């Protein structure tokens, strides 16, 4: 007689993932990282709620797969086999756990240490070369309300109006209640507090009952105390806003580190300002080796602190050359690289493209189109008149660098037929008949720009400039277009830096996987097929 057997359902507990899947490469690379600083970032009290190594793995892989929100990452950990493979049998973390890890742990030095270890690992295995670093910047919108702007100049005007109003109205109000108090032209917050304290003391001494509501008549001293409170609150707010602005011209009320700036994505086509951050990235062999998040709208002031950060992170490993675009050119940046000759600078001068046009070369008002005599230190204008050096002017940058500017003037401009073409208006209120030609020249900057023009025109300079466009700008294109990232999720400079750190790790793993699959390991510079052979 046949034996009946109960049917059984076979459940496979192993996760089948392709051998060449990016998640396997990510897991193998992240297992070689030292997480001692990451664990040290946690408090010593209590236990760690979830393994930070696993959290970092799932977050980096999520950024590789366009899943960057904490709730999307939580859902992926429950449903996606690749994320389950990274969990190593543990339960899926809660979205609050993921968010706390991103905001509180990666914002510290431990996050930058992980990127540094990854770069050094690639460098020691010959996959990354530090011979040339390509730096570029882009503006990314902050997670702040669009119309939450505070303008520094407007706040300064409001402060002046408020101080003027206090200076004009306060004496009469004090005279009405019989209080004597010295009022300076610009009264400070502490002086208003001192006056308010005296008013409260008078109210207590006289036994005055403070009233409010309809049908109640306030005493003059109560109206004065309320007026002082209003002025004091406004003055405190204006002082705080100016302090938050610092060297900037604006900030957002919902993200104090964000600055209002022009974005490339201007859908309204009206030049609308949006709160954002200036993200600077250094790339070597397609890999991101460092990033610098700035609230400055201009790239000029970000190069030196970025280089100091790279020198600190990779101490003992010298970066041979740094290639940047024309937005980073300044005399101060030239001087910094002259003081650090171990790193060579390649920057395209701002007038590099303009010089090629006939309009620029035929502009007689420009110093570059005038003949210069080094022996007599004079310039000769288009009409044959001499511009002689009359004085030397000293200026200082924000960091304290002294810049010497030579002033050249021409005293023979009366009756010149080329005067209107040679002297530009520039908003001057003087009539053209009373004006004369004046040019301001920084000889050191002119020498540095001339030397840089020759350097970037060489064969090596042309190759490096081409690779800067491919490698540095290519990373931004991949993040914005392929990963569809146009706006930060977190607020604050430190948290934004942690968010961009995850993108840097994700991009490096993706580049490494792509190089392995296409067998392009060890290729540092790309030579386009259209590149001139003679350069």
Label every model-predicted segment:
Residues 59, 66-78, 91-535:
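Anion-binding and metal-coordination hotspots
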Residues 32-37, 80, 84, 482:
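A short secondary-structure junction motif
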Residues 69, 84-85:
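Short active-site-adjacent helix-start/loop capping segments
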Residues 3, 54-55, 94:
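N-terminal alpha-helical segment
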Residues 18-60:
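Basic, short loop/linker segments at the boundary and entry of helix-turn-helix/winged-helix-like folds
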Residues 46-47, 87-91:
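A Lys/Arg-rich helix-loop hairpin that forms a DNA/phosphate-binding surface
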Residues 1-7, 11:
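Single conserved hydrophobic/aromatic residue that forms the stacking wall/gate
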């Amino acid at each position: 007689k046949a034996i009946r057997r109960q049917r059984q359902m076979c459940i496979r507990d192993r996760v089948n993932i392709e051998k060449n899947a990016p998640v396997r490469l990510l897991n193998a690379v992240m297992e070689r990282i030292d997480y001692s600083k990451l664990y040290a970032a946690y408090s010593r009290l209590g236990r760690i709620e979830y393994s930070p190594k696993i959290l970092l793995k799932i977050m980096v892989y999520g950024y590789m797969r366009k899943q960057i929100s904490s709730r999307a990452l939580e859902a992926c950990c429950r449903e996606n086999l690749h994320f389950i493979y990274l969990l190593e049998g543990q339960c899926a973390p809660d979205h609050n756990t993921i968010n706390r890890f991103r905001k509180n742990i990666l914002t510290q030095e431990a996050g930058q240490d992980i990127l540094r270890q990854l770069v050094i690992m690639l460098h020691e295995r010959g996959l990354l070369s530090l011979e040339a670093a390509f730096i570029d910047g882009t503006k990314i919108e902050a997670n702040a309300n669009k119309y939450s702007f505070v303008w520094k100049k407007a706040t300064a005007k409001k402060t002046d109006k408020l101080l003027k109003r206090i200076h004009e109205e306060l004496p009469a109000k004090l005279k009405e209640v019989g209080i004597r108090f010295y009022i300076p032209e610009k009264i400070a917050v502490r002086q208003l507090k001192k006056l308010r304290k005296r008013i409260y003391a008078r109210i207590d001494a006289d036994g005055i009952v403070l009233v409010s509501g309809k049908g109640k008549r306030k005493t003059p001293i109560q109206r004065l105390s309320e007026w002082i409170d209003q002025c004091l609150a406004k003055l405190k707010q204006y002082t705080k806003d100016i302090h938050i602005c610092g060297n900037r011209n604006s900030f957002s009320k919902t993200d104090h580190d964000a600055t209002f700036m022009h974005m490339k994505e201007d859908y309204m086509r009206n030049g609308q300002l949006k709160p954002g951050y200036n993200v600077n990235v250094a790339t070597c062999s397609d890999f991101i080796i460092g990033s610098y998040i700035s609230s400055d709208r201009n790239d000029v002031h970000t190069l030196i602190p970025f280089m100091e950060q790279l020198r600190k992170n990779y101490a003992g490993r010298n970066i041979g050359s740094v290639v940047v675009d024309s937005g980073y050119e300044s005399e101060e940046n030239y001087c910094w690289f002259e003081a650090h000759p171990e790193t060579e600078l390649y920057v395209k001068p701002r007038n590099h493209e303009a010089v090629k046009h006939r309009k620029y070369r035929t502009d007689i008002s420009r110093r570059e189109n005038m003949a210069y005599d080094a022996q007599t230190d004079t310039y000769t204008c288009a009409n044959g008149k001499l511009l002689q050096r009359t004085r030397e002017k000293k200026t200082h940058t924000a960091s304290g660098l002294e810049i010497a500017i030579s002033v050249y003037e021409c005293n023979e401009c009366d009756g010149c037929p080329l005067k209107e073409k040679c002297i530009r208006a520039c908003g001057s209120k003087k009539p053209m008949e009373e004006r004369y030609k004046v040019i301001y020249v920084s000889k050191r900057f002119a020498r540095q720009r001339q030397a840089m023009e020759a350097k970037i025109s060489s064969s090596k300079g042309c190759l490096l400039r081409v690779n800067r466009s491919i490698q540095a700008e290519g990373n931004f294109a991949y993040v914005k277009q392929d990963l569809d990232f146009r706006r930060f999720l977190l607020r604050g400079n430190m948290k934004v830096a942690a968010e961009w750190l995850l993108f840097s790790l994700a991009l490096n793993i993706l580049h490494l996987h792509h190089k392995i699959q296409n067998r392009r390991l060890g290729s540092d510079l790309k030579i386009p097929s259209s590149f001139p052979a003679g350069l």
